[in-house]
Amino acid sequence: LLQTLPRFHSNDFLACISLVPGHVQDAPYVEKELGTIYDLENYLSCGRFVQFWEVWNQSKSLPAASPSFESQVRAGILIVVSSTLEKVPVAKMAAYLGVNSDQLQSTLTEAASIAGEAVSIVSCDAETVTFAKSIFNAPESDSNQQPLRFSDIVSIVS
């Protein structure tokens, strides 16, 4: 289940949790760990990245999913942030990725290389991280679109 968390923007977690029998999910010996994993997945899928890192850092009882687990999670977060926002303040981006501001540049480089073509960082200065514009993070209206008149809509509805 932990290995599905870096791909939180897909349905991998739901697919894997459905494979775990109900009596195992309800067993007292895994209840705390499963609850924590559910919380971690919820924080990621809801975009509550800062809370994810807080809970992750407190959950030392969970086994490491893989040696590059945290890097893969950061790449997933970077994909979501870059497809949603064009510019992000450095302090917020560092908090989203669970690192200090002075570690941000190297963390961004590593996460962007893992994310591949899904992320294009234009610049990272002292104040702002800027991503390449896309139709999702910088939507523009279609200048060729003709305005709709009320009479056109009425003829369709009636």
What are these regions (language model features)?
Residues 2-158:
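Charged, E/D/K/R/S-rich low-complexity terminal regions of large eukaryotic assembly subunits
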